Swiss-Prot record:
Organism placement in taxonomy: Bacteria, Bacillati, Bacillota, Bacilli, Bacillales
Protein name: Succinate--CoA ligase [ADP-forming] subunit beta
UniProt: substrate binding residues: N264, G321, I322, M323
The keyword Methyltransferase appears for this protein: no
Quaternary assembly: Heterotetramer of two alpha and two beta subunits.
Organism this protein belongs to: Bacillus velezensis (strain DSM 23117 / BGSC 10A6 / LMG 26770 / FZB42) (Bacillus amyloliquefaciens subsp. plantarum)
Amino acid sequence: MNIHEYQGKEVLRKYGVSVPEGKVAFTAEEAVEKAESLSSSVYVVKAQIHAGGRGKAGGVKIAKTKDEVKEYAEELLGKTLVTHQTGPDGQVIKRLLIEEGCDIKKEYYVGLVLDRATSRIVLMASEEGGTEIEEVAEKTPEKIKKAVIDPAVGLQGYQAREIAFAINIPKELVGKAAKFMLGLYKAFVEKDCSIAEINPLVVTGDGNVMALDAKLNFDSNALYRQKDIMEYRDLDEEDPKEIEASKYDLSYISLDGNIGCMVNGAGLAMSTMDIIKHYGGEPANFLDVGGGATAEKVTEAFKIILSDQNVKGIFVNIFGGIMKCDVIAEGVVEATRQVGLTLPLVVRLEGTNVDLGKKILNESGLNITSAESMADGAQKIVSLV
C-alpha cells in the first residue's frame, strides 16, 4: 500500500527522523491558512499524489509570499499531473503539502529495500541525491553505497556511520546522519514497509540532516496489524478495478494489454502472462482468483476484467487442486451469461474434476474455446484478438 508524502513524514517524525514542518491543505484558502501557521518566509507547495517525478512535472512550487501560496494552490488543485510514474492519464491533485522552505547545502539519497538476492533488508545511499536512483545505478553504480543488515541484530550504528562517511556527509554531521538512518530503519521494520526512500536527504545551512521528501510503501499482507497505517489509505489514488477486486479477495493488477487473464495462483498467473507475451500477445491484467474461488467470485472477476475497455479477449487458465474445475466451469458459464460476453473466451482446465468441468463448458451452448494446455490456450487467444 502506498501513502502520501505528508503521511510518510508523519510516520517518520514519530521515529525521530527530522522532516520540515508542513501541513496538508485541500483548498487554496486552507493552503494560505497553513502557510500562516508556519514560521517561515519561504514556502514549498507540493502536489500530493502516489507517484514520483512531481517536481519535474511542475507539481512542486516555491512561494515567497502568502499570495503566491494561494496562486500556486489554485493552479495545482484539480489539475491532472502527468509524471513518468503516473502513465499518460496522470493523477488528479486533490491535496497539497504546504511546507517550510529550508536552506539546502547538499542533497543525498537514502533508501531501505528488501533484497531478494540476500534475503536481507539493504540500506542504500548515494551522494547523488535529487535524481532518480535507477538513473544513478545505470550510469554511475559506483556512487551507490550499500549495507546488508542482519535481521537478528538490525542496523548497527557503525554501519550507519560507515554509509554516512561513504557518501561524504560532512564529518561534523555524521552522527546526525547515522541517527537519521537508524530511525528510518526502525520505522521500516516496525511498520512493515516494503520500501522507504528519502530522496533527497538534505544537509541544511543550520547544520541539520532532514528528509525533504519521503516515499513509504507498506506490505499489504501485514496491514491487519498496522491499523494506523490503514487509516492513511487514499482510495482516490487507487485503480477502481483493484478496489472492487479487493472486496471479493481477488488479487488484481491492471496492465496495458488487451488480453484479460483469470488464473488461480500467483505463480500460474505470472506464467500465463509470460506465455501470452511469448506468443505475441499483451496481457491486460494480473488476476489471481485464489484457491477457494466460488461461482460468485468468478462472475465478479469477469465483470472486473470487462470493465477495462482495452480488453479484446479473455484467457481463463485454471489448475484445480483445492479448487474444483467443475466449480470454475459453472462460474465461467454463469458469468458469460450474466455479462452477455461477446468477446473471444478461451478456457484451459486441468486438475480436480477436469472432465466434469469440460463437460459443463461443452454443454453450455456458449461460444467458449477449450484449450488442452497453457501453450495451446495462449496461442488460441492471441490468434482470436
